[in-house]
Amino acid sequence: MATWKNLDTLETFKALSEVKRVKLAEVMSGAEGAERVKKYSVPMAEGFSYNFAAKQVDDEVLNALKALAEEAELAEKFEELYNGAVINTGENRLVLHQLTRGQLGNAVEADGVDKREFYVKQQARIAEFANKVHNGEITNAAGEKFTTVVQIGIGGSDLGPRAMYLALENWAKKNNTLKMKAQFISNVDPDDAAAVLNAVDVAHALFVLVSKSGTTLETLTNESFVKEALKKAGLDASKHMIAVTSEISPLAKSDDYLAAFFMDDNIGGRFSSTSAVGGAVLSLAFGPDVFAQFLEGAAAEDKLSANKNVMENPEMLDALIGVYERNVLGYPGTAVLPYSQALSRFPAHLQQLDMESNGKSVNRFGEPVDYPTGPVIFGEPGTNGQHSFYQLLHQGTDIVPLQFVGFRNSQIGTDIEIQGSTSQQKLCANVAAQIVAFACGKSDDNRNKNFEGGRPSSIIIGDSLTPKSLGALLAHFENKIMFQGFLWNVNSFDQEGVQLGKVLAKRVLAHETDGALKVYSDLLNI
């Protein structure tokens, strides 16, 4: 079994801290920079490559990172995870989201059930249901087809599926696989549900309620909101709703739903896009075959993550460089910058995925750690971000590492040539220019116009955004975050930080408050 140790107790981490710092502006200039771009690239699945030429690493740093990976037993820990070890120690649970898209190791059983078979069965049940909806076997009370699917969930039940839907919506339109338009209700703010309900024809809408426990306050509140709207429209809510929940939740056998599809406690919400949580809405929106392609891409990237050779494992390498930046170079955050409008909500999903996983101040044994853990994650699609927060990234007092994502081709293919280049070429020109500008900077006697450079970045480059490549991209970040949690010796698979606020909110609603909580409640007229 692998040994779990704090990062700062590892001899190889101490050695890494003493390696000479790379002067990025120097090594990325001229012929040396050109050679780095060619050399520092690792193939990923589905035509992607992870290029880290503009990171503050060289062969000496990379060798130190390889040694750190070996001492931290990253490959061994991942192997234990996918073979069914209890990695989520805080909740005494397995971690099985990779098993929803493929089996990397041995059969994994929990509670007497083969979990791979369980996930495959749920995917098949969802596929059968979605096909019946699409071919008109399952309809509304008037015998008319459902045209819209609306997911009701929050956190991982919303951010991931929403980001994946938006990433593929235009691809599906282009490829004639958009079966139903999808909408999402997440916030308990009544304006969220009201706005969505005002925008859809509820008589032809199918609602997907997602709650593992069946007791999530925000989700059940929004369900009641939707049921009231259906009632006012003279519709039977039970004929317009399905549930995605656990087999032991109060929703599982309720007559309030057309069908129930199951998830389990071994998959955290933020890792659930490849489970029934994402499977139901994406299969209804695009068809089961498209969802299967998405899983195929994720499974292909998972296989690369199991490689013990760091230089052939893009997720492990990305994780190691990120920890080097956080714990040796002292950088506080990471900006995720996809140069694809289809990935407009991908940074928001990664924000939850990363910050909820590794935003921890105690290790797996409940002991305080004396080093920084998860960074602050934020981002926007390019080129919009360039006209927003890039000013701080270029000339601010903090250095923020950057993670670009770019594609050679657009999804829709509709384009126009203006001034000798297409819009897609202009988009790609901008990302290439930004990488070099951040790394190399520009000297100017006017200090206000001077760019120091030395701002590190990486880029994941692909041909185009498809279901398979989206799956690979998602798995890359999921597994990167997992490896970083291993290095920091934190439990990346629980989220106790979200619980306290929920408890206090219930006290406020029950009017069981005093002190500052009561005064704030009074100010908000609760």
Regions found by a protein language model. Name each.
Residues 4-142, 420-428, 439-440, 462, ...:
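Extended, charge-enriched "interface" segments that sit outside catalytic cores
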Residues 12, 36, 57-65, 77, ...:
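General structural feature for long, well-ordered alpha-helical segments within catalytic domains
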Residues 128-136, 142-308, 507-510:
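Glycine-rich phosphate-binding loops that contact phosphosugars or nucleotide phosphates
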Residues 147-155, 207-213, 333-340, 377, ...:
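Short glycine-rich or small-residue beta-strand-to-loop segments that form or flank ligand, phosphate
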Residues 164-169, 198-202, 224-226, 258, ...:
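Short, solvent-exposed amphipathic alpha-helical segments in soluble enzyme
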Residues 229-414, 453, 500-526:
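Active-site phosphate/pyrophosphate-binding segments
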Residues 414-449:
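Acidic, Ser/Thr-rich peripheral helices and adjacent loops at domain boundaries
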Residues 458-526:
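C-terminal helical/tail subdomains of lipid-metabolizing enzymes
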